[in-house]
From Swiss-Prot:
Recorded phenotype for the gene knockout or disruption: No effect on adult lifespan but larvae show a developmental delay. The larval developmental delay is more severe when raised on a low-protein diet and adults die more quickly of starvation. Accumulation of cystine in larvae. Under fed conditions no difference in larval cysteine levels, however cysteine levels are reduced in fasting larvae. Conditional RNAi-mediated knockdown in the fat body causes a developmental delay when on a low-protein diet.
Higher taxonomy: Eukaryota, Metazoa, Ecdysozoa, Arthropoda, Hexapoda
Alphabetized InterPro entries for the sequence: LC_transporter, PQ-loop_rpt, TonB_box_CS
Location of the region described as Disordered in the Swiss-Prot/TrEMBL record: 373-397
Function: Cystine/H(+) symporter that mediates export of cystine, the oxidized dimer of cysteine, from lysosomes. Involved in cysteine homeostasis during periods of fasting, which indirectly regulates mTORC1-mediated signaling by supporting de novo CoA synthesis, the TCA cycle and amino acid metabolism during periods of food shortage. Important for maintaining autophagy, and for development and survival during periods of fasting.
Tagged with keyword Membrane: yes
Claim: Transport is one of the keywords in the record: yes
Family: Belongs to the cystinosin family.
Glycosylated residues, chain numbering: 43, 86
Organism: Drosophila melanogaster (Fruit fly)
Pfam hit, one: PQ-loop
Compartment(s): Lysosome membrane
Name the record gives this protein: Cystinosin
Domain called PQ-loop: residue spans: 132-187, 271-327
Topology feature Cytoplasmic, residues: 148-167, 232-239, 285-302, 362-397
Gene designation per UniProt: Ctns
Length: 397
């Protein structure tokens, strides 16, 4: 073997050794599922395995952030070097609640076991779990459909009189920002990675149904706004107060985007600021419509179907939160961070107020405004029938 051949062989061996060492060092332990639900006094199993060959034995110690909620068997084990076997760990639910199971090891192997964690939910009843799922789907459908009674009413009347334009302006901005937040966290990997860095044991809060709902809500609101350009609207317009509020929101969004673009804050923070604007809009967006109904002493032109569906969705959403809090003994999710529950309650209270306006306060005005139940086509048909002048009705829009 000449010198050049010997040198080439040596280089190849060094390269193979480097690759093997790199693979060994990059190999980690992980689990087959990071989220598990177990019933009280029942068992569930998760598996620990290596995503490559380890170059040394790794001692793993499993711990929880709440010792009295569940039992782990085994709580400690050694994962052997070069093994591809699965290590089974049995979880026994002892007390309802949300528990995080995390792994620890010696300093040399902490990086290897960092992906060994499980979010465990100990539930009291499987029936309550299924009931919660049903509630979730029903309120998702109710909220999604709630946009269409107003669209249909506008189309049927060929008029948007009675529908407040400030409400529409706030709504389209709110749902646009909500869509940005959901799409960003669901589709953009850089934002997902940043979220994982900040909340290593957390789960992405945005799911596919959130993305679908927000985009659909934005689309339906755009349809309603387009109707305002083509149908009778009298002297209605967006108020200067609404323009001022929207200008403030625009400054917040633009400044936040500039800070994110200049790397002063992360783009994830920009999305959070957008979500805060959306929450603010949720609180105030119904006020202009309620005031308009009060000044007109009528709900004509404002679809009660929208309110009834929104009330159904909001009520079921709160019931689901209460149901889950009971099933998982997690009342802190409501009383410790009341934002979500409070916003749902606030919206439902507004729905109740609108129902009182429609069915109680301005009931006689609604009954006398029969034009809301008559389409332009009906008017044309009756005109074509050439009835006597005394039988011709006057339509109000």
């Amino acid at each position: 073997m000449d010198f050049s051949t010997h040198r080439l062989t040596t280089l190849l061996l060094l390269l193979l050794a480097t690759v093997a060492l790199g693979n060994a060092q990059s190999s980690q332990l992980t689990v087959d599922s990071h989220d598990i639900t177990v019933l009280l006094n029942s068992n569930e199993t998760f598996l620990v395995f290596a995503n490559g060959l380890l170059d040394s034995d790794v001692e793993v110690a499993l711990g929880t952030d709440s010792e009295d909620h569940l039992l782990l068997d085994p709580a400690t084990f050694v994962y052997p070097a070069g093994s591809t076997r699965n290590q089974s760990v049995v979880i026994t639910g002892l007390k309802a609640g949300n528990v995080k199971v995390v792994a620890d090891s010696d300093d040399a192997n902490k990086e290897i076991v960092k992906d060994v964690f499980v979010r465990v939910t100990v539930a009291k009843s499987r029936a309550l779990i299924y009931t919660s799922i049903i509630f979730g789907w029903v309120y998702f459908v109710a909220w999604s459909v709630s946009f269409y009674p107003q669209i249909w009413s506008n189309y049927r009347r060929k008029s948007v009189e009675g529908l407040n334009f400030d409400f529409l302006a706030l709504n389209i901005v709110g749902f646009t920002l909500y869509s940005m937040f959901n799409c960003g966290l669901y589709f953009i990997e850089d934002l997902q990675n940043e979220y994982e860095v900040r909340y290593p044991l957390g789960v992405n809060p945005v799911m596919l149904n959130d993305v679908v709902f927000s985009l659909h809500a934005m689309f339906a609101t755009c349809i309603t706004i387009l109707q305002c350009f083509f149908y009778q609207r009298a002297q209605q317009r967006v108020s200067f107060i609404a323009y001022g509020i929207l200008a403030i929101f625009a400054v917040v969004v633009v400044v936040s985007a500039g800070l994110a673009g200049g790397s002063v804050i992360h783009w994830l923070d920009f999305l959070y600021y957008c979500s805060y604007v959306k929450l603010t809009i949720t609180i105030i967006k119904y006020v202009p419509q309620a005031l308009m109904n009060y000044r007109r002493k009528s709900t004509s032109g404002w679809s009660i179907g929208n309110i009834l569906l929104d009330f159904t969705g909001g009520t079921l959403s709160m019931l689901q939160m209460i149901l889950n809090a009971h099933n998982y003994d997690d009342w802190v999710s409501i009383f410790g961070d009341p934002t979500k529950f409070g916003l749902g309650l606030f919206s439902v209270l507004f729905d109740v107020f609108f129902m009182l306006q429609h069915y109680v306060f301005y009931r006689h005005s609604r009954e006398s405004s029969s034009s809301d139940l008559t389409t332009v086509t009906d008017v044309q048909n009756r005109t074509n029938e050439s009835p006597p002048p005394s039988e011709v009705t006057t339509e109000k829009y």
